[in-house]
Amino acid sequence: MDAIYVPTDNAVVSALKSVVQVAESKQIPLIVGEANSVKGGGVATYGIDYEKLGYQTGMMAIEVLEGADPATMPIETLEDIQLVINTKAAERMGVEVPQDLLDKADQVIK
């Protein structure tokens, strides 16, 4: 099965409506790079939550403002990866999402 992947790219995401229209008209699943794009019509994403990333980055900035030396601070990564599925978008693109995958999803948009 073919699919279209839209990464977290401002140029492409700004034209997401057009990409969704093409994917729907051609019945090609649209997999996206982040949850907001799933809400905008993508079928699914498995990735980070940018709000949580911003919070974590803000906490690190507070440490620096309170005197921590950035050169000695440990590198941090966001461990919380989320599976988000849009069942309406999947249906419009001719995709049947297996129930076991829906059961594993952190968020299902209906």
Where are the model-predicted features located?
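Short hydrophobic alpha-helices and adjacent helix-cap/hinge residues
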Residues: 1-110
